[in-house]
Curated annotation (Swiss-Prot):
Molecular function via GO: DNA binding; zinc ion binding
Transmembrane segments: none
InterPro entries in alphabetical order: DUF5679
Keyword Transcription appears in the UniProt entry: no
UniProt protein name: Epididymal sperm protein E
Taxonomic source organism: Sepia officinalis (Common cuttlefish)
Principal location class: nucleus
Zinc finger (unnamed): 8-39
Cell compartment(s), UniProt: Nucleus
């Protein structure tokens, strides 16, 4: 997927993301799972309901 920025809890700021993938939680909510470009921690960005 394309590169985007999202909030990193460890860095405490918006950081670029890499290795992003769309996932669906058990409650049918969709999110983008990615990693922080600086500290490599896993982070999620909620993108809405799955239907």
């Amino acid at each position: 997927a394309r590169s985007f920025s999202s909030y990193c809890v460890r860095c405490r700021r918006k950081t670029p993301s890499f290795n992003s993938k769309t996932v669906t939680f058990r409650n049918k909510r969709r999110a983008i799972r990615s990693h922080c470009a600086y500290c490599q921690v896993k982070k999620f960005r909620i993108i809405g309901h799955g239907g």
